[in-house]
Swiss-Prot record:
UniProt keyword Ligase, yes or no: yes
This protein's name: UDP-N-acetylmuramate--L-alanine ligase
Classification lineage: Bacteria, Pseudomonadati, Pseudomonadota, Alphaproteobacteria, Hyphomicrobiales
Record flagged with keyword Cell division: yes
Family as reported in the entry's similarity comment: Belongs to the MurCDEF family.
Length: 476
């Protein structure tokens, strides 16, 4: 039995969240009656309202109205008044991943998992399949610039989704094709141990049907280890690793672009003799960074398996519009470029700064707002050593995301640790309003100013070009 067409109102608690809003939008486009609530208005709430959703601001029992089912994310606490009332009424309450799984059962699906790179890779797969005339349905964890939204309903047979591993519910997703970009220690509040994370990813791959396949990054040692444990499922590996089936070669990251070729190895054709190889050449993507070239190689692996031509792939990559908050240029001041990036894990931060370093001959000035005290505390040494490609590091207050402070996990301690680990120029940001003056004193033509974090630093990044362009008062 599949999701009934006549279901009654579907109520989303926290409908403005990036994961919830994408599912809500596809349901709206399918003709379902969607309603919900959120703590505050945001762009996702406003967009869903224009599509016909009824959305209340604030969480109250009466918001449920005539709801037939209630959808919640793991961010919703058990004492949420709407969730409490739904259980009093004996309404079905489903997790976000369960509702996503119901939508996935309507299509053939590509699910993109990994600690980092999921959103960009999901966007790249969607872009390639779109160019290949597959007209996919897409549910992403970030705003795809070409769509202006994180979701779209396509008329084709394929769906592309971002599989969020943070609470383990990605194991509910019925994928035909699975991508794993990397596996790092993250979300230990849920998994408790790194071994548990590894086991979850193994289960994710083993859940694919025998006629499907997994695309896995051989450059990442934990993923390579996982490849060696998977039996009875078809695996396509990718990366710079010489053993990869889809080998990334000839990478050139100059000028804010990624230029590369991919060597395609056909294991079937090569049985009993040398593997047959061919090259997909002259690939260019308007996003810098080795990590993005790897993400593109993962997407290309899927596209080739589904029968897309090299020319169609080449054209789609050149036109890729990127994802909001992934190395997004927000403006320029005095020849210095300003960027906004969602990177909030040390691995992500290092990759973004490496891309910035490869793209400019000027300075790289990193402005970081650590996200969550628990993350900074558990990965403190990694944070202290992930800024090597930044000439200057400016550390702002931790964005708490509702967490209480932890001793030693704050901007002062991180700044001191950066210096202790050998960084030559690290400083704290006393207050957000001090940032423009600080950047004026540091930035020169050709420099990159990269604002990093999953909190409200995105607002600083978009405000900064205008603040820098404003006349400086004599008092300051």
């Amino acid at each position: 039995m599949k999701l009934p067409r006549e279901l009654g109102p579907i109520h989303f608690v926290g409908i403005g969240g990036i994961g919830m809003s994408g599912i809500a939008e596809v349901l709206l486009n399918l003709g379902y009656h969607v309603q919900g609530s959120d703590a505050a208005e945001n762009a996702n709430v406003l967009r869903l309202r224009t599509k016909g959703a009824t959305i209340a601001i604030g969480h109250k029992p009466e918001n449920l109205g005539d709801a037939a089912v209630v959808v919640v994310s793991t961010a919703i606490k058990r004492d949420n008044p709407e969730l409490v009332h739904a259980r009093e009424l004996r309404l079905p309450v489903v997790r976000r991943a369960e509702m996503l799984a119901e939508l996935m059962r309507l299509k053939q699906c590509v699910a993109v998992a990994g600690t980092h790179g999921k959103t960009t890779t999901t966007s790249l797969v969607a872009t390639l399949l779109d160019a290949g005339k597959f007209d996919p349905t897409v549910i992403n964890g970030g705003i795809i610039n070409a769509y202006g939204t994180n979701a779209r309903l396509g008329a084709g047979d394929w769906m592309v989704v971002e599989a969020d591993e943070s609470d383990g519910t990605f194991l509910k997703l019925p994928a035909d094709i699975a991508i794993v970009t990397n596996i790092d220690p993250e979300h230990l509040d849920h998994f408790k141990t790194f071994d548990a994370i590894k086991q979850a990813f193994r289960a994710f791959i083993e859940n694919i049907p025998f006629y499907g396949f997994a695309v896995m990054c051989l450059d990442h040692p934990v993923v390579q280890e996982l490849v060696g444990t998977i039996e009875d499922r078809r695996i396509i590996t990718y990366g710079e690793n010489p053993q990869a089936d889809m080998r990334l070669v000839d990478v050139n990251l100059d000028g804010g672009m990624s230029r590369f070729n991919v060597v395609v190895r056909d294991r079937k054709a090569g049985q009993g003799k040398r593997f047959e190889e061919r090259r997909v050449e002259d690939l260019l993507m308007p996003m810098p960074g080795l990590h993005n070239a790897l993400n593109a190689t993962a997407a290309l692996s899927v596209a080739l398996q589904l029968g897309m031509s090299d020319d169609a792939i080449r054209s789609a990559l050149r036109g890729f519009g990127g994802v909001k908050r992934r190395f997004t240029r927000t403006g320029e001041w005095n020849g210095a470029q300003i960027f906004d990036d969602y990177g909030h894990h040390p691995v992500e931060i290092a990759a973004v700064l490496r891309a910035a370093r490869a793209s400019t001959k000027g300075q790289v000035i990193a402005v970081v707002q650590p996200h969550r005290y628990t993350r900074l505390h558990s990965l403190f040494n990694e944070f202290a050593s992930c800024f090597n490609d930044a000439d200057v590091v400016i550390v702002a207050d931790v964005y708490a995301a509702g967490e209480p402070p932890i001793d030693g996990a704050d901007k002062e301690h991180l700044m001191r640790a950066l210096k202790a680990f050998g960084h030559r120029q690290a400083m704290v940001l006393r207050a957000p309003e001090d940032l423009p003056a600080l950047i004026r004193s540091l930035a020169h033509p050709g420099d990159y100013v990269v604002c990093l974090g999953a909190g409200n630093i995105t607002q600083w990044a978009y405000a900064l070009p205008g603040q820098l362009a404003a006349p400086v008062s004599k008092a300051s």
